[in-house]
């Protein structure tokens, strides 16, 4: 499998998807980690705020879209060009991270939780897309390496995003840095998504997606 990895990482059939997925997973965890530190330390210092409850609430808010929209996301991937959906999702991510940046700048927990829900929805929609795109653009003997790279990249992005988000929040103006970095990463993810080759739906007879 090792011999198949490097050609894939240099191929337009795979590299833009890998970069897009990596940056999306990084942003998810950058914001989650930054929010956890913000709530735990900054708001707890002010008193009257149950930081532990807010952190648990944040986790639930991020996960909720997976339960609410997973079915619709899978159906959408069968009806619309998957590469186009990826681009739409990445445009949405820019606005989501801008909301998060505003939440950090204004020290607004509601805005941060709204951004977190948006990122959960972003991940819910993009999840089926990334796996559906692999067999569209890779030949059969490349699929194992492609899936392995996506999984490895995702876990690495989670690790880096979690560590960096927590670390940056502890420096001067860390919240602003996290917010600006999140928007910059979202912009980069959108640019990489534009290079994903088109993948039109194979069937136009799939039922319209339902939210739940």
Predicted feature residues:
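Alpha-helical transmembrane-bundle signature of multi-pass membrane transport and export proteins
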Residues: 1-212
């Amino acid at each position: 499998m090792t011999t198949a990895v490097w050609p894939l990482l240099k191929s337009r059939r795979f590299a833009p998807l890998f970069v897009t997925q990596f940056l999306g997973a990084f942003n998810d965890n950058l914001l989650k980690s930054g929010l956890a530190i913000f709530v735990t330390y900054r708001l707890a210092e002010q008193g009257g705020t149950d930081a532990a409850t807010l952190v648990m609430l944040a986790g639930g808010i991020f996960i909720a879209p997976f339960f609410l929209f997973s079915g619709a996301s899978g159906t959408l991937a069968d009806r619309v060009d998957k590469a186009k959906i990826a681009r739409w999702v990445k445009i949405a991510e820019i606005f989501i991270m801008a909301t998060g940046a505003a939440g950090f700048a204004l020290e607004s927990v509601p805005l941060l939780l709204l951004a977190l829900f948006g990122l959960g929805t972003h991940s819910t929609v993009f999840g089926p897309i990334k796996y559906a795109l692999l067999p569209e653009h890779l030949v059969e003997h490349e699929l194992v390496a492609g899936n392995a790279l996506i999984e490895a990249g995702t876990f690495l992005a989670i690790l880096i995003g979690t560590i960096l988000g927590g670390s940056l929040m502890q420096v001067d103006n860390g919240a602003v840095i996290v917010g600006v970095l999140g928007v910059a990463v979202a912009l980069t993810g959108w640019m990489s998504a534009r290079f994903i080759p088109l993948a039109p739906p194979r069937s136009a007879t799939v039922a319209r997606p339902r939210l739940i």
